[in-house]
C-alpha cells in the first residue's frame, strides 16, 4: 500500500486587529510562505479574522446599554468574515 504524506504548517500569527482586509493579506502571505517551504495545508488559529474580541473582558462587555460596547461590536460585526460576500475568495 502506498503511503500518502501530508505536510501541515501551523501558523501562529497576530491579526491586523479588526481589519479584515489587512489580515486577509497577511494570511495570504503566510500561506504562500508555508507553501514555499513544502506545506500542503496551513492551519491558523480561530478568531484570526477579524481578531478576538478581547475588549469584552476589559470594558464591562456584559453591559447591554453601553454606548462603548455598541460601537465596538458594530465595528467587530462590520469586519467579520461573511462567506456569501466572498471575504475568503482571496485565500
Where are these regions (language model features)?
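Hydrophobic structural segments
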Residues: 1-91
Amino acid at each position: 500500500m502506498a503511503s500518502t504524506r501530508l505536510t501541515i504548517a501551523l501558523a501562529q500569527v497576530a491579526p491586523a486587529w479588526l481589519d479584515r482586509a489587512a489580515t486577509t493579506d497577511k494570511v495570504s502571505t503566510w500561506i504562500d510562505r508555508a507553501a514555499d517551504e513544502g506545506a500542503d495545508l496551513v492551519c491558523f488559529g480561530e478568531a484570526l479574522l477579524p481578531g478576538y474580541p478581547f475588549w469584552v473582558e476589559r470594558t464591562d462587555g456584559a453591559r447591554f446599554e453601553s454606548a462603548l460596547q455598541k460601537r465596538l461590536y458594530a465595528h467587530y460585526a462590520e469586519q467579520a468574515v461573511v462567506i456569501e460576500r466572498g471575504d475568503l475568495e482571496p485565500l
